[in-house]
């Protein structure tokens, strides 16, 4: 199992790396060149940089990820593309995307978009908290434990 991270704007990269080091798992962070970093990372962490542009990281993840891998993303659309490949998908708030819940999530996203296009307002995400990070870490550890 490799852990892939949809890295653009992900608040849990460091948490994923911490857990992956403990469990001796490889991490692949896919992000745009805008987020290039010279920071030193553990040996098991690699970066794949993609051009700027909507969905460039998503398309690269779909290309690279394999059955049995784990993806960390908040992107419902990306989750829906990799679930049929047998990939486990975890949201940064700690809930797992599944074949059973993805259609409802996509439908909710669609209707929210319709409201916004008509000039309406929908609730945006709340700021990411330390409690969110703790919840995510526990969910990640549990999912990895069940999958190995």
From Swiss-Prot:
It holds the Pfam family DUF188. InterPro entries: UPF0178. Belongs to the UPF0178 family. HAMAP family: UPF0178 (MF_00489). This is UPF0178 protein EF_0842. It comes from Enterococcus faecalis (strain ATCC 700802 / V583).
């Amino acid at each position: 199992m490799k852990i892939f991270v949809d890295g653009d704007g992900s608040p849990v990269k460091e948490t994923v790396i911490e857990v992956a080091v403990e469990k001796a798992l490889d991490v692949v962070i896919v992000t745009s060149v805008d987020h290039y970093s010279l920071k030193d990372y553990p040996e098991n962490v690699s970066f794949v940089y993609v051009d700027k542009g909507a969905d460039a990281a998503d398309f690269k993840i779909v290309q690279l990820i394999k059955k049995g891998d784990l993806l960390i993303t908040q992107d419902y659309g990306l989750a829906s593309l990799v679930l049929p490949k047998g990939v486990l998908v975890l949201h940064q708030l700690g809930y797992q995307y599944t074949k059973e819940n993805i259609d409802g999530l996509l439908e909710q996203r669609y209707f929210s978009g319709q409201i916004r296009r008509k000039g309406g307002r929908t609730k945006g995400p709340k700021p990411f908290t330390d409690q969110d990070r703790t919840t995510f870490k526990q969910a990640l550890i549990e999912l990895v434990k069940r999958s190995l």
